[in-house]
């Protein structure tokens, strides 16, 4: 189920100053909406180091490829898949990591990254 431009606009017109965060949205948002609102995406693939990890399930692809460094990013949302400017990144040594530990570390690092993002970019304090 993919919302169209009108559905996005109908919902978001009630929140013109909103900061929108995406977590596993997996849909392309129309350019008109991306340009009008502050939308950010958390992506569990280190696309600054491995651009081929854009798109779905990057953490699984990185694990299967045995990347020695893994991580996550927060980027501005554009109409292209994971094409927006990367604003924050965090990474870790994934050498010899188990898949179970990879999921745990990525979750922890992603949560930390969002907290740092809100503090730095949006001026939130303790």
Residue ranges with predicted function:
Residues 1-126:
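One-carbon transfer enzymes
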């Amino acid at each position: 189920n993919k919302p169209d431009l009108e559905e996005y606009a109908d919902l978001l017109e009630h929140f013109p100053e909103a900061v929108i965060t995406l977590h596993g949205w997996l849909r392309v948002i129309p350019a008109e909406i991306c340009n009008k609102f502050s939308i950010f995406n958390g992506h569990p693939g280190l696309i600054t180091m491995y651009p081929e990890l854009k798109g779905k399930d990057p953490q699984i692809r990185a694990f299967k490829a045995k990347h020695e460094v893994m991580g996550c990013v927060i980027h501005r949302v554009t109409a292209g898949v994971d094409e927006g400017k990367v604003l924050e990144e965090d990474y870790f040594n994934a050498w010899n990591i188990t898949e179970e530990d990879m999921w745990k570390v990525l979750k922890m690092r992603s949560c930390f990254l969002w907290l740092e993002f809100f503090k730095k970019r949006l001026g939130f304090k303790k």
